[in-house]
Design a protein with these regions (language model features):
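N-terminal pre-P-loop "Q-motif" helix
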Residues: 3-14
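Walker A/P-loop nucleotide-binding motif
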Residues: 23-40
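Sensor-1/coupling segment of RecA-like P-loop NTPase cores
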Residues: 29, 91-99, 103-135
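Conserved NTP-binding/hydrolysis module of P-loop NTPases
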Residues: 46-52, 56, 60-75
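Conserved P-loop NTPase "ATPase switch" module shared by AAA+ and STAND
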Residues: 77-99
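Conserved small helical "lid"/interfacial subdomain of P-loop NTPases
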Residues: 143-168
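Amphipathic alpha-helical "lid/sensor" segments that cap RecA-like P-loop NTPase cores
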Residues: 161-213
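Conserved small/polar residues in nucleotide/adenosyl-binding loops
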Residues: 228-230
Length: 230
């Protein structure tokens, strides 16, 4: 079971955007394993919503799947205010270069004041450097992006109330404040046992995490991997 800790500020920002009314677009972004999905689930738990997991598809395939979702959005929005979540939305335009321009036309057709679009992304570099220009006219409907960062040490300590201060310092030093990593840590085991099980063991869930993260986050992967092995 995933424990919801921290994120009060970000949750309040999402709720404020929802209560503000009007058709709007909010962008929530942050690295993988940072807790975006957990926050979104918490946010929509008392709201009517439509969820779409974006994939990198051709324009034809993207349209086929997305049109069905848009129909559901319009149908629900005719009756009540809803949240339309598009997870990893940056993937939409990779094989569909006019996605944002086309979505703008669909956005304008939504019932007035009934739809809050929540775009979610793990592509930090793209969101911070290219998103606004790629979105074009659609960007004018967007509020300030919300970036999820790692837990602070104090927030991390709340996750392990029975652990000693020393152990919490070690946990934070090893895993940082990444919620997805912290979920794997077993406070009933020693620090050494956790390290062996999660990282040292070749079958450990975090054994190859450093390379995987670099591969998805950095453009010049071979260069950065060479630094690791120096």
């Amino acid at each position: 079971m995933v424990v919801f800790i921290g994120r009060e500020k970000e949750l309040a920002m999402l709720n404020q955007a929802y209560l503000k009314g009007g058709n709007s677009i909010v962008v929530l972004y942050g690295r993988e394993q940072i807790g975006k999905t957990t926050l979104v689930k918490k946010f929509v738990q008392d709201k009517t919503y439509v969820y779409y997991q974006a994939r990198e598809l051709s324009e034809k395939e993207q349209n086929r799947y997305f049109e069905k979702v848009l129909f559901s959005v319009k149908e629900k929005a005719e009756k009540e205010r809803i949240v339309f979540v598009v997870d990893e939305f940056d993937l939409m335009q990779k094989g569909y270069k006019t996605f944002f321009a086309d979505f703008l036309m669909k956005f304008d057709e939504f019932p007035k004041g009934q739809v809050m679009v929540l775009f979610v992304s793990s592509a930090i570099g793209w969101v911070e450097n290219d998103m606004v220009s790629d979105m074009g006219e659609l960007a004018k409907y967007m509020s300030l992006p919300i970036k999820l960062k790692e837990f602070t040490f104090v927030e991390m300590v709340d996750r392990f109330p029975e652990s000693t201060t020393k152990d919490c310092i070690l946990i934070y030093g090893i895993l940082g404040g990444v919620p997805g990593y912290l979920e794997y840590w077993n406070p009933k085991e020693s620090v050494k046992q956790n390290i062996v099980r999660l990282i040292v063991d070749k079958k450990g869930v975090l054994h190859t995490e450093a390379q995987r993260f670099l591969k998805t986050s950095l453009r010049e992967l071979p260069f950065y991997l060479s630094l690791i092995h120096i």
